[in-house]
Amino acid sequence: MSVKQKSALQDLVDFAKWHVWTRVRPSSRARLAYELFADDHEATTEGAYINLGYWKPGCAGLEEANQELANQLAEAAGISEGDEVLDVGFGLGAQDFFWLETRKPARIVGVDLTPSHVRIASERAERENVQDRLQFKEGSATDLPFGAETFDRVTSLESALHYEPRTDFFKGAFEVLKPGGVLAIGDIIPLDLREPGSDGPPKLAPQRSGSLSGGIPVENWVPRETYAKQLREAGFVDVEVKSVRDNVMEPWLDYWLRKLQDESFKKSVSRLFYSQVKRSLTSDSGMKGELPALDFVIASARKPGA
């Protein structure tokens, strides 16, 4: 098959993928997008992260930013030597390999709905001969397949926004944590757009169809105060929901706008994927337009006891 024929066939396949994606309900789009465009997502990532990253001054690139985001979450969770850790919605599992090396937990179990994520992460664990301490399974964040009081820490890095609903995940995490265990989440929520010091209810931007916010179940579209309240209602104490958006949102967008100018990146992904990423990042109707209304938080909460 010629390169031209192969390109035409790939475009046809990609169009079919996009046709399917646009016709599922918004809350299912995130999972389907990760599965349909798995090869493209692998090509866009450095170090197999699928995250926005935490960008400190002088940060050299996306992998460094993503490792720092993983480090921030591990700090919030208090992951330490000997811990049993559950990572929910693990993506390609990059943070789990990072934590295994830097935090020395006894074991990390990852749960994700996307079969390709489970396969890719499991194959890497086998290649690196750590499958006894790092295990990846298919499963639902809102129906965790584990017994009560199994884990010391539960984490979710930039995936809980898609859980339907996220409050069921809070309840499940509380159940599987040991007394004294900690839940830590890196999450995207709407920003309260009120002027500082203003009274009254939070002012939230409306969700947009076909964008990041359009893929968030409506019941998850809550500000920080409500997020913290929902954690307390699930039984947690010592709840903290901290905004880190200044180190996440705009630096990530700046990185990707530069990436779009890189010819080697353009050649590494399908034309449809490139065009959709470009449209999202440069259009006011996409990520560029909605980032000012979104917050990125790191939340932590402890189960009473111990």
UniProtKB/Swiss-Prot annotation:
Signal peptide coordinates: none
One GO term (biological process): antibiotic biosynthetic process
Positions contributing to S-adenosyl-L-methionine binding: L157, H162
Pfam families to which the protein is assigned, alphabetical: Methyltransf_25
InterPro entries from the UniProt entry: Erg6_SMT_methyltransf (IPR050447), Methyltransf_25 (IPR041698), SAM-dependent_MTases_sf (IPR029063)
Description of the deletion phenotype: Cells accumulate erythromycin C and its precursor erythromycin D, with little or no production of erythromycin A or erythromycin B.
GO molecular function, one term: erythromycin 3''-o-methyltransferase activity
Source species: Saccharopolyspora erythraea (strain ATCC 11635 / DSM 40517 / JCM 4748 / NBRC 13426 / NCIMB 8594 / NRRL 2338)
SUPFAM superfamilies (alphabetical): S-adenosyl-L-methionine-dependent methyltransferases
EC main group: transferase
Catalytic activity: erythromycin C + S-adenosyl-L-methionine = erythromycin A + S-adenosyl-L-homocysteine + H(+); erythromycin D + S-adenosyl-L-methionine = erythromycin B + S-adenosyl-L-homocysteine + H(+)
Keyword terms: Antibiotic biosynthesis, Methyltransferase, S-adenosyl-L-methionine, Transferase
Protein family per UniProt: Belongs to the methyltransferase superfamily.
Biological role: S-adenosyl-L-methionine-dependent O-methyltransferase that catalyzes the last step in the erythromycin biosynthesis pathway. Methylates the position 3 of the mycarosyl moiety of erythromycin C, forming the most active form of the antibiotic, erythromycin A. Can also methylate the precursor erythromycin D, forming erythromycin B.
Metabolic or biological pathway: Antibiotic biosynthesis; erythromycin biosynthesis
Annotated protein name in UniProt: Erythromycin 3''-O-methyltransferase
EC number: 2.1.1.254
